Every structure is written in structure tokens, then in C-alpha cells.
Amino acid sequence: MREGECCAIVGQTGSGKSTLLRLLCGLEAPDAGTVEVTGATTATKRGRRAVRHQVGYVMQHPERQLFAQTVEQDVAFGPRNMGLPAAEVARRVDHALDLVGLGAKKGFSPFELSGGQKRLAAIAGVLAMEPRLLVLDEPTAGLDPRGRTRLRGLVADLRAHGVTIVQVTHSMEDAARADHVVVLDQSRVIADGTPTEVFSRANAGKLHACGLGLPRPLSYARELEDAGAPALGDPLTIEELAAALGPLAGAGDAASAAGDDPRDDGPRNGSPRSNVPEEVGA
């Protein structure tokens, strides 16, 4: 992975995703081969310690780890344990809470927050340690639509700030927004590349065989093409799908404008005349 890149890891339960994350974080040593993160190898205890200082790991349901009386105290826990000066701890706490949009909540009890806010507060505690690599294990699992939208916005903001991100996800829509996608099946990589490459027609059989689908916008586009619509390209996000459909909508409007006068109540496009009276008396 390149610095500042976002990589999505997808696969069915039991495919090896969480094990791969633990290897990346230095929580486990590889049985064979090497794992190198930010210049340190995880083959030795010293190397794994070095990796753990560079990697922030947000496990599933991190909000369950909240414990302090205030959000500020909870987010400060990690930086304080690093032995940083109080002023630096305060700076990091404020910066992390601003990143997740909870700057106004730092004096609140974390248990007064909504479910989505609790997760953001827990993530802020990891961000306050300023990791070079942020590892997210199913960050949107269990959240309502608003919470998922906020989390996706946070990931986009972190990428804009140059944070390198690895996220495990079951959401093909989240994977489609990454720079790089790795597909695992039974602890083996079966596809690896950009979202466009991984979700190409050539890989459709592989994905189906391991129980994975396509991002919904791309799936809709291919269904429309198979039904006779013009080629729509490979829209991976809802925004790209809307852009691809725009010209078709314009063509439909133009065809309507070139047809019969809309004031004419006669048949149009071969459809039968309506049997509904134009006016109904009181």
C-alpha cells in the first residue's frame, strides 16, 4: 500500500479478514512470510511493538470500550499513556474530536451520546494517538443509515488529511469508494486491484463463487444494459450512476418534446387512448 491510500478488504465470514488485520497491527506474528508496516517487520517482538506505535486499530463495536466520565477524558487516555506533555495531549484531543465532529461534546459523558456518536468518540481516541496507518474492522456495522453516512464522511475526511486506511467491510458500496480492493476467500487473495478492476465483468464469476455481489449502482447499471439500455460504463457509486443516467433522461425529454403536442389527447407512442374522462362533474 502507498501512504495516504485507502484499501478495502472484503470477503465472507471466515475468509481471513480479521486475521489479516491482526497481522497488520502486530497483534500476531505470521507463520510464514513477512509483514512490513512503516518500515518495521512483525516477525520479532521488537518489530511488533514498533508497528503497534504506528498503527491505530479500531475493532468492531469500539463504543463498547468507552469508560471515562467525559468524552475528553476518554479520548485523552491513549495520548496520556504515551507520556506526552499535557499541552500536546490537549491539542491531540481537540484535533481528534474536531475530525469526527464531536468538538462540542467533549465535556459530555460518552454514555449520553447516540450510538453513532459513541462510535465516533471511540474512533477519536484512536486518532488522538496520530497513527500513520488506521485499521478499521467493519466500521459501519450495526449503525443506522445516518450513522453510516457520518462514518463514510469521516473516512473521506481522513483520506483528505493523508491518513492511510485499511478497512474490512461487507459493504461493496464502501469498498467501491476505496483506492484499492482485496478480495479474500478461504484465506487466499482471489482478486486484487482498483475497484473498477475488481468489480469488472471478468471477475463476476469469482465474486459470485465466494458469495459476494457487486456495488448496487454497478449492479443496477448492468441490469439496465442487459435489458437493452445503452452502455452505462462502470458506475461504482450512486453519484456515478446518476451521471451515467443523466444523458438518457435528457434523451427521453427530447423525444417527448419532438412528439405530439402535449395538449393533444390522442394516442402517443402507440399507447391506447385513455378511457378516463377528462372532466368529472361534481
Regions found by a protein language model. Give the residues of each.
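Conserved ABC ATPase "signature" region
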Residues: 87-105
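ABC ATPase NBD Q-loop/coupling interface
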Residues: 34-50
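Helix-to-loop junction immediately C-terminal to a conserved catalytic motif
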Residues: 25
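A short, proline-enriched helix->beta-strand linker immediately N-terminal to the Walker B motif
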Residues: 128-132
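ABC ATPase C-loop
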Residues: 102, 121, 126-127
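Conserved ABC ATPase signature
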Residues: 109-113, 117
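Catalytic Walker B motif of ABC-type/P-loop ATPase nucleotide-binding domains
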Residues: 134-137
